Amino acid sequence: MNDTICHYTDAMYKQLSPSLKYPQSQLGFYLALKPMEGAIEGVNALINSGLYDVYILTAPSIMNAHSYSEKRLWIEQHFGIELCHKLILSPNKGLLKGDYLIDDISFGKGQENFDGKLIQIGTAAFPGWDSIIEYMLGYMLPKTLYQNYTFSQMKEEI
């Protein structure tokens, strides 16, 4: 979730109390996070495609016990209550199995032990959600269905 579908690092640097060593420890920190560009539309496109059983897997902050409830509320606010039924909070992402894990880092929270393919957002291969959607939906659909279909057109239809 952090720096994958919401701007976690930006919020850390823009905190009103820059003297705090752990700004993420403040009540309300996670609720105030802004969505990443294209993330809401991208996740919804994956869900609506019917090709994937989409779950949100996020590591909680040990510095903020409220991160559990705030992350859940953030998902409800941006995606609706239905996706909250598919929210998994785990400090070790390697404990879970799946076909794909979309994350901003490749190790440190068990990503290196994830049993499927890691799609690392923010890299040359996947700089943002546009490239993830092109890969995920383009990979699964016949080329004639997506070759002239841009992400902005997809956003208009969702």
Map each language-model feature to its residues:
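Structural alpha-beta junctions
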Residues: 50, 80-85, 114-119
